[in-house]
């Protein structure tokens, strides 16, 4: 009797599990449809792939000292810089993150890469390719499955020749393979063979940014976080860099493109996430930027009006409503 009871219970459990799986699949499919109703760039191959990178309810605060108080009497306080932030990058797409300076775009990049300051408090959930990540997991991904194109060229080691630095981003390859890969990328970005022997201080600003792009692409990552990758590049090279991101995404990878250049972003992105005051105020399809009536947030509409093709037509009142304040008050001292 016990064996039969167990068999019956197992059958009931299997039936319940099957029903739950079907319900989950239907819900997941419905959610996927909601996520993928948007249109894409003309060159996009994105057709509703799964989440490669998913951030949910991200909150970041810093423990600061009140700089207005006398030095030895300053009290600590928590300054919230990101709050309730959720964003996702699907396989095969580019998500452009735009917004005013100080809106939290670079802090998002730091959080995704697990680059946490000692005085920071970070809560929320981050998944990479379906796997929940902790700080250790994000650290292991950096430079491999997840690559950064940093905002500042100071990320280059001033004491190491450029060629060796770039090749160091693909240690899994043989020495000959690393060299061949680096030479291929250098040729792509107009960097001559002699650049490999230069030190970072011998590079122009544009050359240094191209070197950073090569570093990010060396190890064939699944997701690239590009933090302002085009300043210092002339228009042709900037377009080529973004086209490479588009090709990278079309191969089933993902790009989180953080930029102030909305025009270039709209050229290659699938979706745009608009940042203001430490969170995403609107996430919309690129096609919706063709008509401000399709944009729901006043700040997003202000960005639309400020585009050159609209004659920088943002009014003073709109600008005042849409302006983003600095996130950390007066550059307070860290704890």
Where are these regions (language model features)?
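Conserved ABC ATPase signature
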Residues: 199-203, 207
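ABC ATPase NBD coupling module
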Residues: 132-147, 172, 289-295
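Conserved ABC ATPase "signature" region
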Residues: 179-194
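H-loop/switch region of ABC-family ATPase nucleotide-binding domains
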Residues: 259-260
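C-terminal boundary and immediately downstream tail of ABC-type ATPase nucleotide-binding domains
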Residues: 2-3, 36-40, 191, 291-335
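Q-loop/switch helix immediately C-terminal to the Walker
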Residues: 158-171
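A short, proline-enriched helix->beta-strand linker immediately N-terminal to the Walker B motif
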Residues: 218-222
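ABC ATPase C-loop
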Residues: 211, 216-217
């Amino acid at each position: 009797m016990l064996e039969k009871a167990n068999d019956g219970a197992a059958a009931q459990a299997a039936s319940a599990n099957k029903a739950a799986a079907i319900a989950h699949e239907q819900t997941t499919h419905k959610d996927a449809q909601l996520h993928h109703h948007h249109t894409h760039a003309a060159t996009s191959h994105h057709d509703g792939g799964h989440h490669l990178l998913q951030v949910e309810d991200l909150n970041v605060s810093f423990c600061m000292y009140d700089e207005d108080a006398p030095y030895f009497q300053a009290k600590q306080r928590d300054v919230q810089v990101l709050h309730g932030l959720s964003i996702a990058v699907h396989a095969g797409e580019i998500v452009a993150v735009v917004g005013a300076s100080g809106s939290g775009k670079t802090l998002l990049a730091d959080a995704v890469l697990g680059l946490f300051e000692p005085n920071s408090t970070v809560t929320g959930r981050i998944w990479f390719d379906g796997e929940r990540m902790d700080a250790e997991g994000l650290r292991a991904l950096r430079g491999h499955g997840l690559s950064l194109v940093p905002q500042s060229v100071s990320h280059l080691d001033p004491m190491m020749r450029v060629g060796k630095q770039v090749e160091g981003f693909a240690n899994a390859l043989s020495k000959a393979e690393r060299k061949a890969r680096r030479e291929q990328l250098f040729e792509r970005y107009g960097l001559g063979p002699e650049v490999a022997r230069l030190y970072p201080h011998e590079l122009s600003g544009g050359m240094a940014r191209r070197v950073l792009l090569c570093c990010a692409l060396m190890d064939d990552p699944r997701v690239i976080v590009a933090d302002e990758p085009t300043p210092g590049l002339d228009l042709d090279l900037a377009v080529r860099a973004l086209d490479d991101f588009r090709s990278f995404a079309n191969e089933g990878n993902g790009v989180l493109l953080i930029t102030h250049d909305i025009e270039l972003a709209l050229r290659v992105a699938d979706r745009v996430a608009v940042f203001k005051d430490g969170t995403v105020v609107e996430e919309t399809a690129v096609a919706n930027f063709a008509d401000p009536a399709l944009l729901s947030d006043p700040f997003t509409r202000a960005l639309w009006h400020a585009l050159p093709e609209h004659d920088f037509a943002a009014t003073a009142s709109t600008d005042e409503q849409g302006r983003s304040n600095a996130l950390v008050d007066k550059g307070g001292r860290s704890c």
